[in-house]
Amino acid sequence: MPTIQQLVRSRRIQIKKKTKSPALVNCPQRRGVCTRVYTTTPKKPNSAIRKVARVRLTSGFEVTAYIPGVGHNLQEHSVVLIRGGRVKDLPGVRYHIIRGALDTGGVKGRTQGRSKYGVKKPKAEK
């Protein structure tokens, strides 16, 4: 426990919290342009082909972002919106692409959890 005199001499240092998504620079989302769209495999013990994109952001960063959902329409030079959120079994992937925003289309035929995949409410059939 420091004395009052020690605190007068040098105040207590604040512990700085390290952000998990530095490329967003304190913004909820960021716009970017896809520089490469490719697939990759997860680390053990999982097995799949995950769709990811390399994105150059307006903040100047180049990041790897995950493309959620079944099927996508992204290609090089597509303008996308990214949010934070890592993919646990893909090392280095700390961002998600938001479906249904800018050039990214929603997931076709999705009826549940639609808001997360950019799908409008289907027309009620008679």
Swiss-Prot record:
SUPFAM superfamilies: Nucleic acid-binding proteins. Residues 104-126 are annotated as: Disordered. InterPro entries: NA-bd_OB-fold (IPR012340), Ribosomal_uS12 (IPR006032), Ribosomal_uS12_bac (IPR005679). One of its GO terms (biological process) is translation. The keyword Plastid applies. GO terms for molecular function: rRNA binding; structural constituent of ribosome. Its main location: plastid. Signal peptide: none annotated. Keywords: Chloroplast, Plastid, Ribonucleoprotein, Ribosomal protein, RNA-binding, rRNA-binding. Coiled coil: none annotated. GO terms for cellular component: chloroplast; small ribosomal subunit. It is found in: Plastid, Chloroplast. The keyword Methyltransferase does not apply. Belongs to the universal ribosomal protein uS12 family. HAMAP family: Ribosomal_uS12_B. With S4 and S5 plays an important role in translational accuracy. Located at the interface of the 30S and 50S subunits. Part of the 30S ribosomal subunit. This is Small ribosomal subunit protein uS12c. It comes from Phaeodactylum tricornutum (strain CCAP 1055/1). The lineage of its organism: Eukaryota, Sar, Stramenopiles, Ochrophyta, Bacillariophyta.
